[in-house]
Amino acid sequence: MTGLASSPKWRYPGADSDEESRRQQTAAGGLDVTTPNVARIYDYMLGGKDNFAADREAGGRVLREIPHSTLACRQNREFLGRVVRDLAGRGIRQFLDVGSGLPTRDNVHQIAQRTGPGARVVYADYDRVVVAHARALLAKGASGVSVIQADLRDPETILAEAGKHLDFSQPVAVLLFAIVHFLTDADKPHEIVRILTRDLAAGSAVAVSHLTGDGTDPARGRAAQEVYQGASAPAVPRSRRDILALFDGLELADPGLTDINLWPARALSPGVPLVFYGGVGFKP
């Protein structure tokens, strides 16, 4: 979920005096661990270990405003799994996961290949640590998996690099999970999605999960956004209407654009306030 180049503005308050932060930075090979990174914040929310003090501090600030954020992130991951299983069950055997984020349990290639043996997956992310972790999976014998380093704001490069591993004359599922909300309006997210889908074969799919403020107290939502203003990428919650426009030219699968916990229609009730909208559109 970090397919974007960063422009850090905020440093962990203890960065200059915290011995742990200095030790972590040395261990990370010079990587800046004093600026919160959206991939590592997400990893922290999922209970992962690939995060540093600044990421945990930022995540804690978000949790103080939106206490159900950890559950919402896990539900987003579960939504990803349901979507990949559904698409593989429909016969799609090629997946392009843009802004894939740090590897965790049940990664896209594992889910896709369990449901559809022979499925090919390309992971695309800008963050070099994410890319290094993903490539480490290949070293452990993962087959049909490729990793490219690319910025979501450069969709032409993503397609060119992914095209070395995927056959775009056949259906491809483009996965944009918890990534488009890190694009500002100036980045023209709708145009980026249009380019990513422009040359897809009929029967291809685009799946999106996107942060929204529709179910959040406005003041708390703004406070949480401020945390990301100082991280590696700002977060831009959008309304259902704005997110729906990402699917222009596509045919939305039932139940349409909805709370991720309600997709598919047989999914369980949310249990937490609305945080992410999600949906799947097909290329006619």
Map each language-model feature to its residues:
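A short SAM/SAH-binding and catalytic strip from SAM-dependent methyltransferases
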Residues: L152-R153, A162-E191, L196
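Conserved beta-strand signature within the Rossmann-like core of class I S-adenosyl-L-methionine
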Residues: S146, V172-L176, I192-L211
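Rossmann-like AdoMet
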Residues: M1-A150, D154-E156, A160-F168, T197
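Short, glycine-/aromatic-enriched active-site segment of Class I SAM-dependent methyltransferases
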Residues: D217-A233
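Anion-recognition interface
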Residues: M1, A186, R220
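Short "lid" loop at the C-terminus of a central beta-strand within the Rossmann-like core
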Residues: I179-F182, L211-T216
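Short alpha-helix
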Residues: A233-L257
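Core SAM-dependent methyltransferase catalytic element
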Residues: G256, N261-P284
